[in-house]
Amino acid sequence: MNTKQAVANRIIELCKERGIAINAIANISGVPPMTVYSMLNAKSQNPGIVNIKKLCDGFEITLGEFFSTSEFDALEQEIE
């Protein structure tokens, strides 16, 4: 798994936990829905920390809470 997939999985997980639709979290956080969908489909080469922070604000969690999962802990180095 790479970082883009881990970010997408985390967004989906948080939406399911909170019963929030993708469009709803986009609207709540002020991130354009197409940007969120690009992040979820791993089309975005760099999801961007600013957009992730906005989504965290919408979920009412910190960046630390967003990244504090076993998926992120298990990521391998992506520099080649």
Predicted regions and their residues:
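A short, Lys/Arg-rich alpha-helix, primarily the initiator
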Residues: 1-21
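The alpha-helix within a helix-turn-helix
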Residues: 15, 26, 56
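Residue-level detection of the helix-turn-helix DNA-binding "recognition helix"
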Residues: 16, 30, 41, 71
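Short alpha-helical DNA-recognition segment
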Residues: 20-38
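Short, charged recognition helix plus adjacent turn
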Residues: 38, 67-80
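Short, basic-rich loop-to-helix N-cap that marks the start of a DNA-contacting helix
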Residues: 43-54
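Intrinsically disordered, low-complexity basic tails/linkers immediately adjacent to helix-turn-helix/homeobox/MYB/SANT
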Residues: 57-66
